[in-house]
Regions:
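Short, solvent-exposed loop/turn elements at beta->coil junctions and helix N-caps
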Residues: 236-237, 320, 369-373
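Conserved core segment of the aminotransferase class I/II
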Residues: 228-304, 311-313, 405, 409, ...
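N-terminal small-domain helix-loop-helix segment of the aminotransferase-like
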Residues: 6-103, 288, 390-392, 410, ...
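Conserved core of the PLP fold type I
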Residues: 66-195, 204, 210-231, 323, ...
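Conserved glycine-rich beta-strand-loop-beta hairpin in the small C-terminal domain of fold type I
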Residues: 283, 297-308, 321-341, 379
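Short beta-strand
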Residues: 33-36, 40-42, 233, 321-326
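PLP-dependent enzyme catalytic core of the Aspartate aminotransferase-like
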Residues: 343-347, 356-365, 371-448
């Protein structure tokens, strides 16, 4: 029997990070070089490398017998814990009734896009997961290219909004940002919020990286600035290194009573409820404790140390520009200065650059600009600096915290050798590219 797939599903591409997994398996199976067996320099995979906090692991084991369905919005203990968590860390008074729990923020953002009417405004570069969801739902959307410092321009946001006919528009705000690692500060958020109020723009504020903000005092939730029009999403995957637990939450605006009813209907229809044992484990993760505070401080500091090293090392390579991260475990590297040399060797899209970097002898895995909703010919890439043993590195950090600049550099070299070697290999790739381009030029001159 021949099965026919719905065309809108056919048109959706596999997210770049998952597609890369498949490609790597195929590549290593046919690579004839012995060096291929070592693996790759993993700058493509955005997963926190640290262990799940022990108190969450223990809570999960303790509640493994919880086999009953949970309430659709989440168990009361968890919604209460999330309410207190937001008060303690983000200074927001959130009634538990405004909190809905789901199987990860990715699914919750999809659910919000399902129920909210209006054209979606997507700032670019963007996390690679937003656009496939928007397309799957057949929603109208417009890109909003960020300004030269890779942040949202309120002026450009207003200009775009004035061109749209919808009574309600939806802005996806990812703060801190994946892929740039940048943070919108309070003043910048206030300027964006002013436009949103004036233009009736609803905000989905994806704050999954909030706890990774290096100077945590600088993080401000959009929910504090624009509470009447902001849906906040957050979860366990980045702050608690528990992406596999698949648990996130959304905070509704205070007066969105009818919308909550509609949302509950969607959740009940699509997945009933999040795994009950996982919810009890999440209670332990969101409860205020000294253990969790220590965990946040340490992992945040390690991300910062790795980010500083990666930024400085890439910026030291002639022709490469990079965003200096304020948070997350990513930065955006700009290789467009090499565009002429790349095109000479028939690398004319960011996808082809990604493919050229992964093959022998380079073995460099990145997420290219086209996957980040940039132009296909934009030679930018997301660089994730988490290719190390997080359990071991966390223990080494506790044993001997680096204090000086030189100690921080040594910490990276000793604990993240693949990050260090991978950046050196990026340098080698572009040196070889320029050498090849120079040789071609000399050959052409001889012919003349």
């Amino acid at each position: 029997m021949k099965f026919i797939v719905d065309q809108q599903v056919e048109d959706i591409e596999m997210p770049e990070n998952l597609k890369l997994n498949t490609f790597l398996k195929e590549f290593h199976s046919v690579c004839p070089h012995s060096e291929c067996s070592f693996g790759l320099y993993g700058f493509a995979f955005g997963q926190s490398p640290f262990p799940v906090p022990l108190l969450m692991q223990e809570a999960l084991m303790k509640n493994a017998n919880q086999g009953a369905y949970a309430p659709v919005p989440g168990i009361p203990e968890l919604r209460n814990a999330i309410s207190k968590y937001n008060k303690h860390y983000f200074g927001m008074d959130i009634a538990p009734e405004r909190i809905y729990v789901g199987p990860g923020t990715k699914e919750l953002i999809f659910n919000l896009l399902e129920i909210l009417h209006g054209t979606v405004i997507l700032p670019t570069p963007a996390w690679l997961g937003y656009l496939p969801q928007i397309r799957l739902l057949k929603k109208n959307y417009h890109m909003l290219p960020t300004n030269t410092n890779k942040k949202i321009s309120p002026i450009d946001l207003k200009k775009l909004s004035l061109r749209l006919q919808d009574r309600q528009k939806i802005l996806i705000l990812n703060n801190p940002n994946n892929p740039t690692g940048l943070l919108h500060n309070r003043l910048e958020l206030e300027e964006i919020a002013d436009v949103c109020r004036e233009q009736n723009i609803t905000v989905i504020s994806d704050e999954i990286y909030a706890q990774t903000t290096y100077d945590f005092s600088k993080f401000v939730s959009m929910g504090k600035i624009y509470p009447e029009g902001t849906f906040i999403t957050n979860g366990l995957s980045k702050s608690h290194a528990a992406g596999g637990y698949r648990l996130g939450y959304v905070i509704f605006p205070q007066h969105a009573v009818d919308l909550k009813r509609q949302f509950k209907k969607i959740l009940a229809t699509e997945y009933t409820a999040v795994s009950t044992p996982i919810q009890y484990a999440a209670v332990a993760g969101f409860e205020i404790s000294k253990e969790i505070d220590i965990y946040f401080d340490a992992t945040r500091s390690i991300h910062q140390i790795m980010g500083e090293y990666t930024y400085n090392a890439l910026s030291a390579i002639e022709g490469i520009k990079a965003t200096k991260p304020d948070a997350t475990f990513y930065l955006l590297a700009d290789f467009n200065a090499f565009a002429t040399e790349l095109q000479k060797v028939k690398i004319n899209t960011s996808q082809k650059l990604s493919e050229a970097l992964i093959v022998h002898p380079y073995h460099i895995a990145i997420v290219g600009g086209d996957s980040l909703v940039l132009e296909r010919t934009d030679f930018s890439a997301r660089i994730a600096y988490v290719d190390y043993n997080g359990t071991k590195v966390l223990q080494n950090y506790f044993d001997n915290k680096p204090k000086t600049s030189s100690e921080r550099i040594e910490f990276v070299k000793n604990n993240a050798p693949k990050v260090v070697a991978g950046i050196e290999m990026i340098c080698t790739f572009f040196k070889n590219l320029r050498k090849e381009s120079l040789n071609d030029l000399q050959t052409q001159k001889k012919k003349v």
